[in-house]
Amino acid sequence: MTFNVAEALTDFTRRYVELWQEETGLPPASSDLYGIPSSCIERTGDGVVYWLPKLFSVHEKLSKVETALDIRLQDSIHDYYVTQLAGDMPASFEGQNLSLIQVWSDDDFIRLQENLIGHLVTQKRLKLSPTAFIATIDSEMSMISVCNLTGQVILEQSGKPKRVILSADLASFLSVIKPATSL
C-alpha cells in the first residue's frame, strides 16, 4: 500500500496509540509534557499527561522557515509537521530506537520553526546540504532527518557531512517504523 506522508503519519500514530492502549489500557502518556498546555491532553495524573492526537488547526505550513532562509522545503517536511498535534512518539527502525518529533501546540509550532531555522543556518554555515530533523535517537549528536535536496530519510551527525540513507522517502519510513511505549 502506498501512503502519502500525512496518511503514513496518521497510520503510524494509530498504531502507536493502539499499542499504548493494549499495554496500559490508557492513551499515550508523557512526563516531559506534563504541565504544558495542548488540545491533545485527555487527562493528567501522577506527573504525567495522557494525550491523543488532534488535527493540526493552523493553516500555515513552515513558511517562516522558508522565508527566513529563502529556501523551499520538501512538501514531505511540511506535511510531516502540519498533519497533527501530538506528543513525541518512541519507535524503532531496524533495531535503532528513535523518538518522532511532533508538534504539541501552536506555541510549540513556533518553537519548532525557530529550531529548524537554527539547524538550517548551522548547516549553511558549515556548507552542508540542508536537512530537516524529524526524530531524535539515543545519541545526542545524531538525529534522523529528511534531506531537503532528495527527500530521503537519513541518519546524520550534527555538523558532520557523513549521512546514512535510511529510506527513499518519508512516507515509506513512517510506514515501516515500529511503535514503542518507551525508549
Question: What do these predicted regions represent?
Answer:
Residues C147-T150:
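Short acidic-glycine loop/turn motifs at beta-strand connectors
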